[in-house]
UniProtKB/Swiss-Prot annotation:
The chain crosses the membrane at residues 28-48, 74-94, 99-119, 135-155, 167-187, 203-223, 236-256, 263-283, 288-308, 338-358. Pathway: Cell wall biogenesis; peptidoglycan biosynthesis. It is found in: Cell inner membrane. Belongs to the glycosyltransferase 4 family. MraY subfamily. CDD domains: GT_MraY. This is Phospho-N-acetylmuramoyl-pentapeptide-transferase. Keywords: Cell cycle, Cell division, Cell inner membrane, Cell membrane, Cell shape, Cell wall biogenesis/degradation, Magnesium, Membrane, Metal-binding, Peptidoglycan synthesis, Transferase, Transmembrane, Transmembrane helix.
């Protein structure tokens, strides 16, 4: 909004001219979301405590240390969503179609998460909305996003680029839409599965969003994209501001979510954040890179899939003491803080590997 309001004065005012730069607006987005999180966080937590009689339901079969978390409110993802959306609307170019499509997906996935959290806190169990119903809703929203990208964006591409190779890409044709839906829904649920310990998912989400802030900026810049031999995608640079908003809001949320957490992100936050990262990876044509920089989310998801299939195949045996993987290490004697920090380090390693693909070709 500020960009659009100041646009006529960019060439006449040094201050207005600053808003012409995506880098300046992105840095400002981080500061705005951080400030908003600190401002609304305590009030939101108090409101959620009043609203939720029992707080986030705690699994009885989980690590014993988790029983101390009983009564902690959930739906804290509202803080992330409000601050990110406000910052994006304030600082991004509101004539940019990518911004509106991304915001649509972000808010839509947050509504699914909210309904899931609401069902959990009202019924006082951890089941929430049925899995098939949730997947169906996620699939519908992802399909709408793909249709919007297909018919509102100039020259939509169905190419799948393979990282670390200069010219290796595949034209999936209209099958790309199904692949994109898989990426978006998969990312949404992968982040949701990772969000099981205080602060565990928050930092990897921020790192992944930061990675795609850089990717969005590079592919949206003709000079940098040509230099790095990336597919040039005009107008995607504005997504840098949205990604920066997520980074700032996640860091602000971590202030309240660090162990011992005052509030949980809930599905309201995890489903929406994972979904929107999937959407941005599709827009920037870096879907496989999302699987690399978000490698921690992939590992957590694979651990659940392996556990479920092995349990069914062996009629009751388990590969891990508990899935997702972070619970396995808790059951093995690691403290929660050790699991969280070590997983953050692993996430950082994946991010560095993923970003190296931008240059190593």
């Amino acid at each position: 909004m500020l960009y659009n309001l100041l646009l006529p004065y960019i060439h006449n005012s040094h201050i207005a001219n600053l808003f012409h730069y995506i880098t300046f607006r992105s840095g400002l987005a981080v500061l705005v979301t951080l400030s908003l999180s600190f401002l609304i966080g305590p009030r939101l937590i108090k409101f959620l405590q009043t609203l939720q009689k029992y707080g986030q339901p705690i699994r009885l079969d989980g690590p014993e240390s988790h029983q101390a978390k009983a009564g902690t409110p959930t739906m804290g993802g509202i803080m992330i969503i409000l601050s990110s959306c406000f910052s994006t609307l304030l600082l991004a170019d509101l004539t940019n179609k990518y911004i509106w499509i991304t915001l649509f997906g972000f808010v839509s996935f947050s509504i699914i998460g909210f309904l899931d959290d609401y069902a959990k806190v009202t019924k006082n169990n951890h089941y929430g909305v049925k899995g098939k119903s949730k997947l169906l809703l996620q699939g519908i929203i992802s399909l709408i996003v793909c249709i919007l990208l297909e018919y509102t964006i100039d020259s939509p591409s169905h190419m799948l680029n393979v990282p670390f190779f200069k010219s290796l890409s595949m034209d999936l044709g209209y099958l790309y839409i199904f692949f994109a839906i898989f990426v978006i829904v998969g990312a949404s649920n992968a982040v949701n599965l990772t969000d099981g310990l205080d602060g565990l998912a928050t930092v990897p989400i921020a790192l992944t969003a930061g990675s795609f802030a850089l990717i969005s900026y590079l592919v949206g810049n003709l000079i940098y994209s040509n230099y790095l031999q990336l597919t040039y995608l005009p107008n995607t640079g504005e997504l840098t501001i949205f990604c920066a908003s997520i980074v700032g809001s996640c860091l602000g949320f971590l202030w309240f979510n660090a162990q011992p957490a005052e509030v949980f992100m809930g599905d309201t936050g995890s489903l929406s954040l994972g979904g929107v990262l999937g959407i941005i990876s599709v827009i920037t044509k870096h879907e496989i890179v999302l699987g690399i920089v978000g490698g921690l989310f992939v590992i957590e998801t694979i651990s659940v899939i392996m556990q479920v299939y092995y349990f069914k195949a062996t009629k009751g045996k388990r590969i891990f003491k508990m899935a997702p993987l972070h619970h396995h290490f808790e059951k093995s004697g690691w403290t929660e803080s050790k699991v969280v920090i070590r997983f953050w380090i692993i996430s950082l390693i994946f991010v560095l590997i993923g970003l190296s693909s931008l240059k190593l070709r």
